[in-house]
A protein has these predicted regions:
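Acidic, Ser/Thr-rich low-complexity segments on the non-lumenal side of membrane proteins
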Residues: 89-126
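Surface-exposed interaction regions that form or flank ligand-binding interfaces
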Residues: 1-99, 106, 139, 146-151, ...
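Hydrophobic/aromatic beta-strand patches that form the interior of the parallel beta-sheet core
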Residues: 156-158
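Structured, soluble extracytoplasmic/luminal domains of envelope-associated proteins
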Residues: 122-154
């Protein structure tokens, strides 16, 4: 299980803060460049104004990312679920292909996954969202598995926490193969 970055517990909340701080920092740099040009050259029609305006493009990108992460963070893994998963994982927690706080986006739907695990040739995931279309999520995974040459992995998305934990107990003891590792990398790549 990942301790930092995608797949780590609290990732969505940390990323929302990180994106916001980057946006504020870049906004301050752009404002400083504009104000230096305005007060130093006493007009706003300068190359420094152009640089400041072009600098707003990355600021806008970070603001959009921040908004996406802020929207997704309400689906972060609950602390009690994290503790339960870690308890079940036990001494295998470093070997398991499992992670927390995934938020997948597609053209027409978004899929928040609090916990996901790849083992025994299957991807199991839990979503706390009652509105998550589990069949669409499965189709989304299968489409990208096909595009990436991954086969033989069954996808199951649970909306019931207890059923997910029961299935997680069943798959936790299995050794991982290369196909499962490729599937987990795909999960990380598809997530925000």
């Amino acid at each position: 299980m990942a301790e930092k970055g995608k797949g780590s517990f609290g990732y969505l909340k940390k990323q929302a803060i990180k994106q916001g701080l980057f946006a504020l920092g870049l906004l301050a740099v752009c404002a400083t460049i504009f104000l230096i040009g305005f007060f130093w050259l006493t007009q706003h029609n300068t190359i420094l104004t152009v640089i400041a305006v072009l600098g707003m493009l990355p600021v806008a990108k970070f603001i959009v990312s921040m908004i996406l992460f802020m929207k997704a963070e309400r689906f972060s893994c609950a602390p009690h679920l994290y503790e339960e998963v870690m308890k079940i994982a036990g001494d295998r927690k470093d070997d398991l292909l499992a992670g927390f706080d995934f938020y997948l986006t597609s053209y027409d739907k978004n899929f928040p996954l609090s916990v996901a695990c790849v083992a025994k040739d299957c991807l199991i995931a839990y979503t706390p969202s009652e509105n998550c279309d589990c069949n669409k999520c499965k189709e989304h995974f299968e489409e990208y598995m096909k595009k990436n040459g991954i086969s033989g992995i069954n996808v199951k998305v649970f909306t019931d926490e207890k059923k997910f934990l029961e299935r997680f107990k069943q798959v936790r003891d299995d050794e991982t193969n290369e196909n499962e590792k490729a599937m987990y990398r795909l999960l990380l790549n598809l997530s925000l």
